């Protein structure tokens, strides 16, 4: 009863959780209610497409997680969606989606999505970088603006591992992401993220 006029005026309900993005579409998660409600999770990406971003929370609620990037058998894999912002007064920010896995012969995996901002807790964790191609291709870097850095992607037979995401600034501060493993035959491991 209270949601209908608020939805009509502001395009967002007063109370309630946002809808999740449908899997395989890369659709963004819906925003949570202005007062109470968590953001919906982003939908995973179709093959080679980016995952959807997580929806933002209102005053109280958690941000939605970013959707995973779509894996690809040829060409580049999709990046993970960004996590949604946490509640302005109370709530946890959403984690970034993992980058898609590349099954091609010479392409990199998808980048991990960034963790959501804000909330009463630390910002959301960055997504893990996608793994590189089976023969050639570097792993993508993990990302984060706050919270824990995402791990770097793993390379294939030849290629460097992705660098880990940097630790986010906050109280307490986030942890750095681990570097991805280099190629099985040739390639360097990725660097650990910075504090």
From Swiss-Prot:
Belongs to the mycobacterial PE family. PGRS subfamily. Keywords: Calcium, Cell wall, Secreted. The keyword Metal-binding does not apply. InterPro entries: PGRS_rpt. Its main location: secreted. Mediates Ca(2+)-dependent up-regulation of the anti-inflammatory cytokine IL-10. This is PE-PGRS family protein PE_PGRS61. Interacts with human TLR2. The keyword Methyltransferase does not apply. Binding of Ca(2+) to PE_PGRS61 induces conformational changes and increases affinity for TLR2. It is found in: Secreted, Cell wall; Cell surface. GO terms for cellular component: cell surface; extracellular region. Changing residue 166 to A: Decreases Ca(2+) binding affinity.
């Amino acid at each position: 009863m209270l949601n209908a006029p608020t939805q009509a005026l502001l395009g967002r309900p007063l109370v309630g959780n946002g809808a999740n993005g449908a899997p395989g579409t890369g659709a963004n998660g819906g925003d949570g209610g202005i007062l109470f409600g968590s953001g919906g999770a982003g939908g995973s990406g179709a093959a080679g497409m980016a995952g959807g971003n997580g929806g933002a929370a209102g005053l109280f609620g958690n941000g939605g997680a970013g959707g995973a990037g779509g894996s690809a058998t040829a060409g580049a894999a999709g990046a993970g969606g960004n996590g949604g912002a946490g509640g302005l007064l109370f709530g946890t920010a959403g984690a970034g989606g993992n980058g898609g896995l590349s099954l091609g012969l010479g392409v990199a995996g998808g980048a991990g999505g960034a963790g959501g901002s804000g909330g009463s807790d630390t910002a959301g964790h960055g997504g893990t970088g996608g793994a590189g191609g089976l023969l050639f291709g570097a792993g993508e870097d993990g990302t984060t603006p706050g919270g824990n850095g995402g791990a770097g992607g793993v390379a294939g037979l030849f290629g460097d591992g992705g660098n880990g995401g940097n630790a986010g600034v906050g109280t307490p501060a986030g942890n750095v992401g681990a570097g991805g493993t280099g190629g099985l035959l040739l390639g360097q491991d990725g660097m650990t993220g910075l504090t």
